[in-house]
Amino acid sequence: MIVFRNVTKVYTAGSRALDSVNLQIDDGEFVFLVGPSGSGKSTIIKLLTAELDPTSGSIEVNGYRLETIKKRQIPYMRRTVGVIFQDFRLIENKTVFENVAYGMRIVGASSKEIKARVPYVLDLVGLENRGRRLPHELSGGEQQRVAIARALVNNPAMIVADEPTGNLDPQRSYEIMMLLESINALGTTVMVVTHEQELVNRFTKRVIAINEGKVINDGMDGYYINEET
């Protein structure tokens, strides 16, 4: 569960990125977080992964209260949230298997655990025959699937996908969204951060709209108007 209570974030330059934001995402939900560039979406991601501290307010992430969390607990909290980046952030000289396994190695998983878990996750995302490939040998859609597998490998409670289809054509975008839906159906909470109007409106999900640092709409109508277009 993610809870923001009256969260405000003001950067050192004085710009107010978030203004008294209240939101709650329950376990097992699928949520779109939408808004134009500069609306505060990226700040929300950085706050819930403890990359930033709020100026005021409180944040709870999967049972961790971030205003009181100890530094040594932050890595454990972050393991409960798998982040998928728009630019994939794959290690170019490592195979698909090694890229996904990396997430397990940094938390101290054994070779036996890695050999059992990584093939399972690659199969889940449809890359069971791509484990020995390097990133440059894959299509954009396949690279995004590797990024999803890496985010999933430590079995997080929640996946945060930051513009996961921004570099993909419409068909590949739809396939990635269907994959995220299937992951959500297995019980993982999914938050997709996007400004793509057509993508959001194609799926009937909860939509949290943010603009100028404020939540301006939160509903299950699955409809979003991107005012930038």
Put a short name on every predicted segment.
Residues 134-138, 142:
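Conserved ABC ATPase signature
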Residues 153-157:
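A short, proline-enriched helix->beta-strand linker immediately N-terminal to the Walker B motif
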Residues 159-162:
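Catalytic Walker B motif of ABC-type/P-loop ATPase nucleotide-binding domains
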Residues 170-172:
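Helix N-cap at the start of a conserved alpha-helix in ABC-type nucleotide-binding domains
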